[in-house]
Swiss-Prot record:
Organism: Pseudomonas putida (strain GB-1)
Lineage, highest ranks first: Bacteria, Pseudomonadati, Pseudomonadota, Gammaproteobacteria, Pseudomonadales
Cystines in this chain: none
InterPro entries: G6P_Isomerase, G6P_Isomerase_C, Phosphoglucose_isomerase_CS, SIS_dom_sf, SIS_PGI_1, SIS_PGI_2
Family in the record: Belongs to the GPI family.
MF-aspect GO terms: carbohydrate derivative binding; glucose-6-phosphate isomerase activity; monosaccharide binding
Biological process per Gene Ontology, one example term: gluconeogenesis
Keywords (A to Z) from UniProt: Cytoplasm, Gluconeogenesis, Glycolysis, Isomerase
Name of the protein this chain belongs to: Glucose-6-phosphate isomerase
Protein task: Catalyzes the reversible isomerization of glucose-6-phosphate to fructose-6-phosphate.
UniProt xrefs under NCBIfam families: PRK00179.1 (NF001211)
Keyword Cell membrane applies: no
Length: 554
């Protein structure tokens, strides 16, 4: 029987019990001492794959820890779960769907059946459609209503229709194609549209409306605003098709909006939004970096898919990262995880991983709807490089919470300035080192004596200078950011999230919590504009509605 049909109490498994006992035995474990005692620790706890290098030696683990965590993966049936996903079985139980974002990066010639139909020809048909459109725009053949070539593309979408594409197009900016600029419009805040449209010309702007249902509130409101702006700037209804295309499974709604059927790129219900950048949702990526580089992105993700399916768990990068997350979240009390990219172009990766992880594993019931017996997904947060060192790293070093971190850094910069990159790389390594080593009371006192302080002042100041250390982190190194390596990196985190969902017995591919806010939002809106006089369900919400209505102008 498939794993998703047999929800388990993971805390009752022998491997979980063994890990609990091991955690108790690890209470006094010191990474500083472990490195001093074992010159091979770095080699034992690091690996390379798909253009990525992972150092996970700065973790609160021994070889026994790793073995016990791998035992847990085996006991929950992880290998069967992986096979089920890649085979197209219905692992999204609450929605009755397979999960096949991995199909989008499989090569020509592969076969994969969904309900008895090989979906791969359709996948590659859409990829060819993307290639054709991108070629026409880059070659100046797609023209606006004034017959001028398109110079700006605006992707209108939110959530997975925005975060993944924005991450990739920004991360691969050094690969950007000249002549076409890509922009993103997500928030329903009118200020975002105002600031964006101020720098655009309607006659040379193409809008991509990305919404699977073509019914997403924020996306439709922004699409209507873009349409109104386009008409006010001199465009006509008759020429609308030159300036609006869609990525949607609702062709009828897109056609009713004014988009020609041949300019509607399909989506499939077996691709979730936060896993959709590999699909036609990635059209703005292809427009930004070209289809050759987009295909390299897909190829890099495919290499990670192969690694994930074939590597033994103790040498499997996504599996190891997932197991470490379980180790800290369920046995060490960690409630959050920091993502710290030391690269300007990767500055948006934290936002994408927030959605990927928190929307996937922010669940409190098992696949069968019964309550979980343990904590599930952590809060994902962080930010770019050295900026964080002068903001929130203080809490990582001396705060009371254990917060594991992933440092992500390239060896080579696209834009070397003097010795800046050497300093950037040095800062990345020194932060992970400082988290691990810390500073003892004796070291703090010796440092203060070296500065000439008297013993009374040393006694007062030393406690403030002590840094506990023993704080875990992973360091992910790439030689240089490229489409292929970025594809592997993003796919790695996708698989990490899936592995954790299997261990906890939850569904990583639905998001019912998001829907409640949408439903309630309709009633709040009606009360704000006066079309519904009935009071809100609670006094707080009604009070805030009254506050708005008493002061809003416009």
């Amino acid at each position: 029987m498939a794993y998703y049909r047999t929800p388990h109490d993971v805390t009752a498994l022998p491997a979980w019990q063994a890990l609990q006992q091991h955690r108790d035995a690890m209470q006094g474990f010191s990474m500083r001492e472990a490195f001093a005692a074992d010159a091979q620790r770095f080699d034992q706890f690091s690996l390379s794959c798909c253009g990525l290098f992972l150092d996970y030696s700065k973790n609160l683990i021994t070889e026994q820890s790793r073995d016990l965590l791998v035992n847990l993966a085996n006991e929950v049936g992880l290998q069967d779960a992986i096979k089920s996903m890649f085979a197209g079985e219905i692992i999204n139980a609450s929605e009755g769907r397979p999960v096949l974002h991995t199909a989008l990066r499989r090569p020509v010639g592969d076969k994969l059946s969904v309900n008895g139909v090989n979906v791969m020809p359709e996948v590659h048909k859409v990829l060819n459609q993307i290639t054709e459109l991108v070629g026409r725009i880059h070659d100046g053949l797609w023209r606006g209503y004034s017959e001028k070539p398109i110079t700006d593309v605006v992707n209108i979408g939110i959530g997975g229709s925005f975060l993944g594409p924005e991450l990739v197009s920004e991360a691969l900016l050094p690969y950007a194609q000249r002549g076409v600029r890509c922009h993103y419009l997500a928030n329903i805040d009118g200020s975002e549209f105002h600031e964006l449209s101020a720098n655009l010309r309607a006659e040379t702007t193409l809008f991509i409306v990305s919404s699977k249902s073509f019914n997403t509130l924020e996306t439709l409101k922004n699409a209507m605003a873009a349409r109104t702006w386009y008409l006010a700037q001199g465009g006509s209804e008759a020429e609308l098709y030159r300036h609006f295309i869609a990525v949607s499974s609702n062709k009828a709604a897109a056609v009713a909006f004014g988009i020609r059927e041949e300019n509607i790129f399909p989506m499939w219900d077996w691709v979730g939004g936060r896993y959709s950048l590999w699909s036609a949702i990635g059209l703005p990526i292809a427009l930004a970096i070209g289809t050759a580089n987009f295909k390299e992105l897909l190829s890099g993700a495919y290499t990670m898919d192969q690694h994930f399916q074939t590597a033994p768990f103790d040498k499997n990068m996504p599996v190891l990262l997932a197991l470490l997350g379980v180790w800290y979240g369920n046995f060490w009390g960690a409630n959050s995880h920091a993502i710290l990219p030391y690269d300007h172009y990767l500055r948006n990766i934290t936002k994408h991983l927030q959605q990927l992880d928190m929307e996937s594993n922010g669940k409190s019931v098992l696949q069968d709807g019964t309550p979980v017996k343990t904590d599930t997904g952590p809060v994902i947060w962080g930010g770019v490089g050295c900026n964080g060192q002068h903001a929130y790293h203080q809490l990582l070093h001396q705060g009371t919470q254990l917060i594991p971190a992933d440092f992500i850094v390239p060896v080579v910069s696209f834009n070397p300035v003097a010795d800046h990159h050497q300093w950037l790389y040095a800062n990345c390594l020194s932060q992970s080192q400082a988290l691990m080593l810390g500073k003892t009371r004796e070291e703090a006192e010796a440092e203060l004596r070296g500065k000439g302080l008297n013993e009374a002042d040393i006694e007062k100041l030393a406690p403030h200078k002590v840094i506990p250390g023993n704080r875990p982190s992973n360091t992910l190194v790439v030689e240089r950011i490229s489409p292929r390596r970025l594809g592997a990196l993003v796919a790695m985190y996708e698989h990490k999230v899936f592995v954790q969902s299997v261990i906890w017995g939850i569904n990583a591919f639905d998001q019912w919590g998001v829907e409640l806010g949408k439903e309630l939002g309709k009633g709040v809106y009606q009360r704000l504009v006066g079309s519904l006089e009935e009071s809100a369900e609670d006094g707080s919400t009604q009070g805030l509605i009254n506050y708005f209505r008493g002061r809003h102008r416009g």
